[in-house]
Amino acid sequence: MGGIVGKPESATSTWMPETKLEAKMVEAMQRRAAEGTALKSFNSIILKFPKIDDSLRNCKAIFEKFDEDSNGTIDHEELKKCFHKLEIKFTEEEINDLFEACDINKDMGMKFNEFIVLLCLVYLLKDDPTALRALEATFETLVDAFVFLDKNKDGYVSRSEMTQAVTESGEGSTGRIAIKRFEEMDWDKNGMVNFKEFLFAFTRWCGVGENEDEEEGEEKN
């Protein structure tokens, strides 16, 4: 996401967000980056995977509650009802932007992993989302992880920043690991990763969504 003006890994002003939502994400992440991070290594992020996974799976009850037709996805109307019930105050335009951004398959419905990404974006963009307080620690860890990777604090993670973050752990074969992880995040292949792309990759790393797909397959057999 975003457009290049000059080299993609230079100063903040050379990388321009393509949408209002992306611009808001970048601005919010830059503010958060100014506060710093307690994480010291990429390994410290990996060690948090199991705990984060368990916490995110607790969102399943919320997801199923608002998936009123039980088709495994939340459509636009169900999302608006969800926001109203959780007292998340967004404008119609903001809801539309969030839905479009998180519906990566463009099938007019959000699967569980897409719903998790949306809730985390809500957490990032709202100053005090009290409705999400139960997930605050988990979402803050995800924000913290992105801040750790974003070495120049411009709101994006570049390939060189990912390599630096992974190689700091000092283990062997870290260069290949860094490139693989970066490619998993950079799904639009533009050389820069925003927070949304990071979240989708992180849910895959933790296994969120994979087990749900397997369970659906078993039910059909």
Predicted regions: what is each one?
Residues 181-189:
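Long amphipathic alpha-helical assembly cores
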Residues 72, 108, 154-155, 191:
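Acidic, glycine-anchored loop motifs typical of Ca2+
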Residues 2-70, 76-80, 91-101, 106-149, ...:
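EF-hand Ca2+-binding helix-loop-helix modules
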